[in-house]
UniProtKB/Swiss-Prot annotation:
It is an enzyme of class 2 (transferase). Residues 18-170, 176-333 form the N-acetyltransferase domain. One of its GO terms (molecular function) is mycothiol synthase activity. Monomer. 1D-myo-inositol 2-(L-cysteinylamino)-2-deoxy-alpha-D-glucopyranoside binds at residues 46, 203, 242, 261, 299. This is Mycothiol acetyltransferase. It comes from the Bacteria. SUPFAM superfamilies: Acyl-CoA N-acyltransferases (Nat). Catalyzes the transfer of acetyl from acetyl-CoA to desacetylmycothiol (Cys-GlcN-Ins) to form mycothiol. It catalyses: 1D-myo-inositol 2-(L-cysteinylamino)-2-deoxy-alpha-D-glucopyranoside + acetyl-CoA = mycothiol + CoA + H(+).
């Protein structure tokens, strides 16, 4: 059994799995909900949640389960999962996320999970970046102790919709028209524009048909809220919106309800024309407002100054921050 802080024993055993059973999925989903209630923010990304399916393999992804070692033995009822880590991304550039049950924190489980991630990188070791959602102090402290460097910040921005925050009229560039995405017909063209628009983005620009299909199969998918822009028959931009049935991180003192999302906005470099990204954003916002939503959120990298400037110009403000930590290869003293 591994040791936690000050030599205290870690009360969990760690197991790597390429797939999950239905029972594993139920336990992990329950763990995520418990952590979210305690922390006020979702502990893992949508990408990770989409892999939580029984017997589903997704590329080189692997699951690391921390199972309680203080409960009954394997011959009895299922022992609870008290920690979980997801290792995804390409084999040479890994992305990971970690969550520990609030009732089992401070026992070294997070450290054990993070250490196991670094030991699973191969030889020579692959790059490893670990996301921490909510920019919580305990995650920052653990990252520093284990030799991780803070390298990327993802803002969640929000703005209200409706009469309290009127939206400007969208102004499309000359020759550009907008219509709804047609599943099956627009897939390849959309993937090409997405890859070009996010060529420097470590996650979004790598999407494949499988990634698109996973999201099209989700209950929230609605092509009526997926807008594509064309010029002379060529797809040159898009705005994909999303509606969450329940706001996972409502402002303090408010009751959680539905909320819209600017899921992703992209413009083909050099082909869209000035102002297309702003116009597409406004078209999507007006759609979400027409659906009766009172607020909208989006995610954007802190260092994407152009996009941040556009969104703040549309009255978005920072709601939460997620942080990516890069492993430097050696733990701090």
């Amino acid at each position: 059994m591994a040791e936690g802080p000050y030599g205290r024993p870690v009360t969990a055993s760690l197991t790597w799995q390429p797939t999950l059973s239905a029972a594993d999925v139920d336990d992990i989903v329950s763990l995520l909900a418990t952590a979210e209630r305690a922390d006020g923010t979702g502990p893992v990304s949508e990408d990770v949640r989409l892999t939580l399916r029984p017997d589903q393999r997704v590329g080189a992804a692997r699951h690391l389960l921390a199972v309680s070692a203080t409960g009954v033995e394997a011959s009895g009822p299922r022992r609870p999962i008290v920690g979980y880590a997801h290792l995804g991304g390409a084999l040479d550039s890994r992305q990971a996320e970690i969550v520990v049950d609030p009732g089992h924190r401070g026992l070294g489980i997070g450290r054990a999970l993070a250490t196991a991630l670094t030991e699973a990188l191969g030889d020579p070791p692959a790059r490893l970046d670990v996301w921490a959602h909510g920019d919580l102090p305990p995650a920052a402290a653990l990252a520093a102790r284990l030799g991780f460097a803070r390298t990327r910040v993802l803002f969640q921005l929000r703005r209200p919709l409706g009469a309290v925050a009127p939206l400007p009229e969208p102004q499309l560039p000359a020759g550009v028209t907008v219509r709804a995405f047609v599943p099956g017909r627009d897939d390849e063209a959309w993937l090409a524009v997405n890859a070009a628009a996010f060529a420097d983005h470590p996650e979004q620009g790598r999407w494949t048909l499988d990634d698109l299909a996973l999201r099209r199969a989700e209950p929230w998918f609605d092509p009526r809220g997926f807008f594509v822009a064309e010029r002379d028959g060529q797809l040159v931009g898009f705005h994909w919106t999303k509606i969450h049935e329940v706001d996972e991180t409502p402002p303090p003192g408010t009751r959680p309800g539905p909320i819209g999302e600017v899921y992703v906005v992209g413009v083909l470099p050099g082909a869209g024309g000035a102002g297309l990204g702003r116009a597409l954003t406004l078209i999507g916002l007006r759609h979400l407002q027409a659906e009766g939503l009172a607020a909208v959120l989006l995610y954007v990298d802190e260092d994407n100054e152009r996009a941040v400037r556009m969104y703040t110009g549309l009255d978005f403000t920072v709601h939460t921050r997620d942080v990516s930590y890069h492993w430097r290869g050696a733990a701090a003293d």
